[in-house]
Amino acid sequence: PLYKQNMKEEIAELKAPLGIYMVPGNHEYYGGISESAKFICGTQIHLLRDTVVTLKGGLQIIGRDDYINKRRKSLKELMSTCDRNKPTILLDHQPHHLSETQAEGINLQFSGHTHHGQVWPVSWITDKIFEQSHGYKKWGKSNIYVSSGLSLFGPPFRIGTQSDMAVFNITY
């Protein structure tokens, strides 16, 4: 979690004209979701937990709580508050049930969680567990991007996989 790595200085350097948005992941829960949320809310990051925000120009961002929270809202429920004629981005930490993304007409989904296995040959396992374990894929009318991320789980190294920080310039 960000609070355990004390990343306030790094976060303060981020610049985004329409804001910085984040959803919690499983490690925010493992490390203490209350402490994580408190830390994040003390930064410029907007923490989205089953929340929809509409930006200037109508772009909608849906932030889902993590899959580990069995009480999180369904994507269908979150989409019921959206204008389906406006572009929609979904932030969902774990890339599960991508067919729902397609069915609900999400334009773009960003996920992470997998670390793309972090250490070869675990990447083969993540490729089997997840419909999309890393990178970009078009699913019907939906675009899915799963980042390998910058951080690590367990040992502080990667073998046979790459860290990744993607920058998307989105116009609408």
Region roles according to the model:
Residues 1-172:
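Soluble catalytic domains of enzymes that build or remodel membrane lipids, polysaccharides, and related
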